[in-house]
């Protein structure tokens, strides 16, 4: 059986995602689709709007055959490590290819871009350092260095100002760095851009647009036409039970408490928290009544919103720099769900899979997995605050979902 891999967050699963996985399967001429999906906390440093199990159900209903969790260590990391973790897992599970969405759907500009940077690495790194010295943020410095090289060596390259192109580049980079035989493929994105708001006449919207619409109206009807019926039903069921979708705003009381129980110097223990920002974080926490006002007090030219959110995520979950440095690569494959075809694939390929395949978490003993379970427990704690409805599934007790 031929498998194509995709890297996803499904926050939530929408019509654009359904198109992407259908096209990925078609272009790859694959029998099954394997998705590596972030768990409870995501790459932009924020909690998923619904838990990993609900999103797994959405994925299986939408046509994914196997859903594997991207460990917290990678799901909350900068793009380079996020991609490395995901591509490592897709390679280990035996995918022949991986597919990602991009602005124009052509793989050659991605290959050109990788070669440009790889062949001029010394100059590229020097340009980044020069830009950082001016006080520019790291993402802006990367883009500056890239622009300088593209002007010096003209060719068809990708636009690295586009979020999906950035991730696509890092997926390709990870595959090359890992010396993986997995083949890169790209699918053109349709209609909605990453940050676009919902449009009344369109059935396609970005996940960001959907979350913003729900945050501003609290009406599920506003997003009904841009998500599959099954996703809409799962979102409706979630909201009926928990009265909210997860966000840092809804987590704010517990997040504020977590920050304030530390001293400023203690905050620097946590992953990505750079010395110099700890006092600003503490001062903002003490003087803010909401997450948004907290963030507005900290963000600056040097620290992007996303970078600060990742720091905050690690403070909230207690994930330290020491822990981060102790991991070099994914150490297991956590199975979240599978279709009948997915189960058949695993049955045939199980002996060839390069990492331990975990379906019964309670029987496993792995330091990286323990971090995932702890993050899920803290996520559940915030969701269940003030709610008398049924409890969320206990992460270490929940078996893979079968569809």
Curated annotation (Swiss-Prot):
Gene3D superfamilies: HUPs. It is an enzyme of class 6 (ligase). InterPro entries: Rossmann-like_a/b/a_fold, tRNA(Met)_cyd_acetate_ligase. The keyword tRNA-binding applies. This is tRNA(Met) cytidine acetate ligase. NCBIfam families: PRK13670.1. The gene is tmcAL. It is found in: Cytoplasm. Belongs to the TmcAL family. The lineage of its organism: Bacteria, Bacillati, Bacillota, Bacilli, Bacillales. Its main location: cytoplasm. It catalyses: cytidine(34) in elongator tRNA(Met) + acetate + ATP = N(4)-acetylcytidine(34) in elongator tRNA(Met) + AMP + diphosphate. Its EC number is 6.3.4.-. ATP binds at residues 7-20, 101, 164, 189-190. Keywords: ATP-binding, Cytoplasm, Ligase, Nucleotide-binding, RNA-binding, tRNA processing, tRNA-binding. Catalyzes the formation of N(4)-acetylcytidine (ac(4)C) at the wobble position of elongator tRNA(Met), using acetate and ATP as substrates. First activates an acetate ion to form acetyladenylate (Ac-AMP) and then transfers the acetyl group to tRNA to form ac(4)C34. One of its GO terms (molecular function) is ligase activity, forming carbon-nitrogen bonds. The keyword GTP-binding does not apply.
């Amino acid at each position: 059986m031929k498998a194509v891999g995709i890297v996803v967050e499904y926050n939530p699963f929408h019509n654009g995602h359904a198109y992407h996985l259908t096209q990925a399967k078609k272009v790859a001429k694959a029998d099954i689709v394997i998705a590596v999906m972030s768990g409870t906390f995501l790459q932009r440093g924020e909690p998923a709007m619904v838990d990993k199990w609900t999103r797994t159900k959405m994925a299986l209903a939408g046509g994914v055959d196997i859903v594997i969790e991207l460990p917290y260590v990678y799901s909350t990391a900068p793009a380079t490590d996020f991609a490395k973790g995901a591509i490592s897992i897709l390679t280990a599970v035996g995918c022949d290819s991986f597919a990602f969405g991009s602005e124009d759907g052509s793989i050659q500009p991605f290959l050109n871009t990788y070669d440009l940077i790889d062949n001029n690495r010394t100059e590229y790194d020097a340009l980044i350092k020069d830009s950082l010295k001016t006080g520019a943020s790291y993402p802006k410095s990367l883009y500056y260095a890239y622009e300088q090289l593209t002007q010096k060596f003209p060719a068809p390259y990708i636009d690295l100002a586009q979020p999906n192109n950035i991730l696509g580049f890092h997926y390709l980079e990870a595959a090359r760095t890992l010396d993986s035989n997995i083949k890169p493929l790209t699918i053109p994105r349709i209609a909605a851009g990453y940050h676009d708001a919902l449009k009344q006449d369109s059935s396609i919207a970005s996940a960001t647009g959907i979350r913003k619409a729900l945050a501003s109206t609290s009406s599920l009807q506003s997003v009904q036409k841009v998500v599959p019926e099954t996703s809409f039903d799962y979102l409706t069921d979630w909201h009926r039970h928990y009265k909210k979708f997860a966000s840092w705003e809804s987590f704010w009381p517990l997040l504020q408490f977590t920050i304030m129980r530390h001293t400023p110097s203690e905050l620097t223990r946590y992953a990505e928290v750079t010395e110099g920002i700890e006092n600003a974080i503490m001062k903002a926490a003490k003087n803010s009544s909401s997450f948004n006002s907290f963030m507005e007090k900290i963000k600056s030219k040097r620290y992007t919103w996303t970078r600060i959110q990742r720091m905050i995520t690690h403070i909230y979950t207690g994930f330290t720099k020491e822990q981060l440095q102790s991991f070099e690569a994914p150490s297991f494959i956590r199975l979240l769900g599978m279709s009948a075809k997915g189960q058949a694939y695993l049955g045939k390929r199980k002996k060839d899979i390069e990492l331990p395949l975990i379906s019964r978490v309670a029987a496993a003993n792995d330091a990286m997995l323990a971090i995932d379970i702890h993050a899920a427990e803290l996520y559940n704690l915030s969701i269940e605050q003030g709610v008398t409805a049924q409890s969320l599934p206990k992460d270490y007790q929940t078996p893979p979902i079968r569809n």
